[in-house]
């Protein structure tokens, strides 16, 4: 699997990224020479790395070059949460409306879909744990001590079902859930502070709202709304299927029918 991933990245570099990097290196040279203004530069990760001369590192000869690792990170970050979570949302909503048929009328309501997608994000993380190396000795509020250089992991699944925050039914999907002020409805799924996911707003909406009045809806709500407007429902003859030989919290197949397409 790792070899296949490396081959895919190599193909991406050869077909798209190398030419893009070469162009941005040249644009950076022209910008520094005063031939073009900053407004003439594209706004993307590659140009940002070129402008601060951070597109190559000393260890590039020993591993996948730094610049391609950054490109792969942003590509994965821009699509992984959406592609991982939406199947979970569809399955959860199907189960929910069977038990709460009155909510079927909300399937095209952006705010309701925002709540539903937030619940799925909370319950099904693409990356259950985030690892960091401690920069200094620190004592956590629990009293646990972490030494400088020690690796620690933020384990989101446990935090995301804490009864004190999400209620006694926190382990279950509930688009009607209310969370305390200051808490995100998706819990720790996207991280927090300096370690927050850079692509969160792309998925959840700019201001974390699902309605047009308060901000962009985000990719999850837009896709869900478009699908339900086309009469999307799970295929009764082909139920969702989990992957075999893996404990990863994902779906291998979620067949759907668009009744109004």
Which residues does each predicted region cover?
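Buried hydrophobic packing segments
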Residues: 86-93, 117, 155, 207, ...
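Conserved cytochrome P450 K-helix/beta-meander segment immediately N-terminal to the heme-binding cysteine loop
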Residues: 155-182, 190
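Cytochrome P450 heme-thiolate "Cys pocket" and heme-binding signature region
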Residues: 177-254
